[in-house]
Amino acid sequence: MKRIILASVAALGLALAACGQQQQAPTSGEESSGVTAPTINTNIGPDGAAGISTALSMDLMSVRAAAPLYDVALVEDQIEGQTFTAITLSTGGQEVFRLLPNADGRHVHAIVTNSVRAKGPTQESVSSARFAVAPPEQVEFCLSEFVDGAAGFACSTAEDGNFWRVYMVPEGYDGPSDPFDAIDPDVLHDSVLVEMRWIAPRI
């Protein structure tokens, strides 16, 4: 009798185990839900921005093909009173990058960002990173530059560098800001990153 009971218990255990395995087996729908969605490229550095690394044609079709996960749109822009058409890359209703045209307006000259979503070469972001933590070899050459009417400066590896970090000096600073070397060293260290800029290769 004991053998019969033990055999029945063993058979029941095997049946329950098989049932458990069937319940744990994922359905085709569950398998597809585990697929990782593509990640939007928010990086900018010497090699490009948003996955763009060439002087693309300044048209929506070309830019959409190069940055398919972004919402791409034409916008009117101006620099020093001169108007031109730029292209924006946005996600979630917020602009992340802006593509600026070259002199003839046919190709991308630069891609700039002042979005906190964009990440620089060391994963730094606008409004939080300071000049003091920038890699020295990446900011060897600096020039004074006004930022929204305030004193600031832009730095790269050299005068012809293709990636620039733009900083604004702390609010309230009333000392000299031009040339760059005239800015107080302590002020430089506390200056905040406000823009990153990639320059496209010349056509």
Show the residue positions of the predicted features:
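Bacterial N-terminal signal peptides that target proteins for export
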Residues: 1-8
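Short alpha-helical interface elements
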Residues: 4, 88, 158-160
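Repetitive helical segments and hydrophobic/amphipathic motifs
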Residues: 11-12
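C-terminal motif of bacterial Sec signal peptides marking the signal peptidase cleavage site
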Residues: 15-18
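Short helix/turn-capping signatures at newly exposed starts of structured segments
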Residues: 20-150, 156, 179-203
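Long, compositionally biased
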Residues: 96, 158-177
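A broadly tuned "polar low-complexity/structure-edge" signature
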Residues: 152-153, 162
